[in-house]
Regions:
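Catalytic PLP-binding core of fold-type I/II PLP enzymes
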Residues: 210-244
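Active-site and channel-lining beta-strand-loop segments
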Residues: 28-51
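Conserved active-site segment immediately N-terminal to the catalytic lysine
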Residues: 248-260
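Active-site-adjacent loop/helix segments that line or gate small-molecule/cofactor pockets in enzymes
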Residues: 1-35, 92-93, 194
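Short acidic, glycine-rich surface-loop motifs adjacent to enzyme active sites
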Residues: 193-209
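PLP-dependent aspartate aminotransferase-fold enzymes
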Residues: 95-197
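Glycine-rich loop-to-alpha-helix module at the N-terminal edge of alpha/beta enzyme cores
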Residues: 4-6, 18-20, 46-133
Length: 260
């Protein structure tokens, strides 16, 4: 029987907690090396990493093709002028933006950002610019991030929201079956309130891997058009090919106005 964490990891985690704010760490794993889907901690214990929910996680560790590209880029003068993508133009950003557009909805533009929560924050700001400072709509059990604005529309764990003020939000049920009696709840909200946007995941990640019913998402798109409200799909955890298509909305026969 292997004791996890081992002695080195236990010691480091204890020392770590003395000097850092323990906010998102949930498991006492101290990674030393990794290759493909295997990682090894500082005690020499090997783990299989099944995480694939965000960012580049599905690519695993130390993918040889990626390492070669990074090595080539960092060892040449190509990387010398890339201070920050938001300050200067560069070919690499143009190329990746073009590739993203080739697999996304038509007539849209790309805005690069640092994290999922920051993407949601800016999606909200874009909607506010169009509609004004009105309430937004999000679904119960959705997760959109822990920054203050995104947190207002994160409804997966109440503990995350304790002691923080909220932006105005209207909550609706996330329906997973077409026969749900509350599948038209959004229509009642839009009849009563003028809103700035509708924000939802299609497959809820942190909320429990709940898959939205096809009718639910199609109704949201229909009502967003009918009431002229921007529809934001949060694809941070479901996008980039994780469902067999580039974006999960493709399975539903609809497109968002804004996507993160």
């Amino acid at each position: 029987m292997v004791n996890i964490p081992g002695p080195k990891a236990t010691k480091l985690v204890d020392e770590f907690k003395k000097i850092t704010y323990d906010s998102t760490f949930t498991y006492p794993l101290v990674i030393k090396t990794g290759r493909r889907c295997k990682i090894e901690d500082i005690d020499g214990i090997e783990f299989l990493d099944f995480t694939s929910n965000i960012g580049s996680c599905p690519l695993g560790y130390s993918h040889p093709d990626i390492l070669e590209i990074i090595k080539e880029y960092c060892s040449s003068e190509r990387g010398a002028h890339k201070i920050a993508g938001q300050d200067f133009y560069c070919e690499e950003h143009f190329n990746i933006a073009s590739k993203l557009l080739s697999v996304s909805k038509k007539n849209c533009k790309v805005f690069f950002i640092n994290s999922g929560a920051e993407a949601v924050e800016n999606a909200i700001k874009i909607a506010y610019k169009k509609m004004g400072p009105l309430p937004g709509v999000s679904c119960i059990s959705d997760f959109h991030g822990r920054t203050l604005g995104a947190l207002s529309f994160t409804l997966s764990k109440e503990v995350q929201k304790t002691n923080f003020p909220e932006l105005p939000v209207k909550r609706i049920k996330f329906c997973t079956v077409d026969s749900d009696p509350q599948i038209n709840q959004l229509e009642s909200v839009l009849k009563e309130y003028k809103v700035a946007f509708i924000l939802t995941e299609i497959i809820q990640g942190e909320g429990g891997l709940n898959v939205a019913s096809k009718l639910f998402i199609q109704n949201i798109r229909k009502l967003a058009d009918e009431y002229n409200v921007p529809l934001i799909f949060d694809e941070v955890q479901s996008g980039m090919g994780r469902t067999g298509k580039w974006w999960v909305y493709e399975h539903y026969g609809v497109e968002p106005d804004i996507m993160t």
